[in-house]
Each structure stands twice: as structure tokens, then as C-alpha cells.
Amino acid sequence: QGLLPPGEEGTDSPAVVDDIDGEPFINDDGSGYIFWRRRNAGRLSADRLHLDGEPVTLATARQGYSEGPVMFKRKGIYYYIYTLSGHQNYVNAYMMSRESPLTGFVKPEGNDIFLFSSPENQVWGPGHGNMFYDEGTDEYIFLYLEYGDGGTTRQVYANRMEFNDDGTIKTLIPDMRGVGYLAASQETRPNLALQSHFYASSEKSPRTSVVNIETQPNQPLPEKGSVKSYTRTHTYQATHVADESNGTRWMAADTDSSPFITVDLKEIRKVGECQL
């Protein structure tokens, strides 16, 4: 269902809220809502062009600056996802309501922080994300960004979200396996790129990061006993574009004003399909 009524998609109007991370939500009855940073939310007018009434601030179990909200509904339960902290300690927590998109939210039973860093899988600071779902199959995919090397990394990750019988969200362990089209390839044809030479205008220098990560954000140990130090090095070689890994990438040098990359197949080859 579109956010605006049919025929009004191109309407030029002021921003509904003068802020960032606006998250629209359309309820089952067609009523519209919008959520934005700092736990703010409001009901939308019928034309979706302004707020209907005063905004509210949603109360959450955890305090601290928050942005990147997500709202969705599953089996009669409204889920409000909000972020906390940042960089390598970025996490996603949630609240549940059986009343409405703006009222009745309570802390779920068990762990309310469902997504956080996985040093074992080399994913640091899974932050601002959003939901794709198919109500017909009850399949929910959570997409998010990784902020472990600062706010400009923004590598996109995706994992399936699963639920317990009571509707609570199971802890989601971030990884680089991907889902759907980006999951482990079942392709049996040879990847010609793996046998090719790659030439790039430049390559960004390797970057080594040393960070302290809270490994138990739901129940931290006293005196930072669950905070551990981790080190990793990112490289940005041209060959990364074809290594069939979701966790690597090529990046040109910061001083490269006209970046390009060339793949040399070394001989005339028949290419069956290109995937970008």
C-alpha cells in the first residue's frame, strides 16, 4: 500500500517532520503513522502530508540517544525497534504492544536487545536497519548497516528474523552469509571473474581498527567485565569485487577523483550472465 493516496504521489509539500530517519507505517485499517529519531512518533493525516494531532514520545525500557526507528506489525503485535549507543557498540532493541502503534508498549520477556556485535563473525556495530517481510510465508528479513569502523562504513547486511511462540524476537546473530539472492550461491557454472585479472585506478590503503566491544549488552558484567578488545584489518583490493564474499569490497583511494575498475578475462570468453 502506498504512503500517499493514488494520484498524489508527486505532491510537493513541506516535510511532515523537520527531522531525520522518518519511518512511515500503515496500519491494517489504512491509518498512517510516522516515527523518527529520539523516540518521536505521530499519526498522519488522511492525505499523509502532515501530522494529525500532537506528536508523542514513546517510552522505552532503555534510555539514551536513539535514531533509526522501525515499526511493523505481526500477528496482532506492534513492534517498535530503536537503536542505542554507536560505532562498534551499536545495538538494536525493541518494545511490544498489543494496543496500537502509539500506545501500550512494554519491554518483552527475556532479552530486549536482539541484535548486537558478533566479533566471531567480524560484524561490529549492527545499527540502523529496516524490515522486509512476506506475510504470506511469515518470513521476516532484517537489513542493517555496520558501523564498527565509523559512521561512513555503511556496509549492508541481511539476516532472517525469527520469533518465539509468545511473539518475542529471537536473538539475531549477525553474519556475512546473506539471504535470498545474496545468500551462498548455488551456481554451478564457473565464475569467470575468479580466473581474471583486475585493474583498478587505485586501492584504498588497509585499515586496522582496535576497539572495545560490550559482548553482553543485555546483561553487562560489573566493572566492564564483559567488555573485550578486538582487532581487525580491512583491505580494499580490486579482486574483492569477485571473491563471492558479502563481507569484502573494493574501494578507491580517497584522493582518486575518477575511480574505475577493469576486469580482464585474458581471452575471448562467452559470458552467460553478469551479476552485480
Give residue spans per PLM region.
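Beta-propeller and closely related beta-sheet repeat lectin domains
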Residues: 20-23, 67-70, 127-130
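Beta-rich carbohydrate-recognition and catalytic domains
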Residues: 1-63, 73-78, 83-120, 135-137, ...
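A short beta-strand element within beta-rich, extracytoplasmic domains
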Residues: 269-276
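Disordered, acidic Ser/Thr/Pro-rich linker "stalks" and the adjacent N-terminal cap
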Residues: 180-268
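Short, surface-exposed coil-to-beta transition loops
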Residues: 125-127, 154
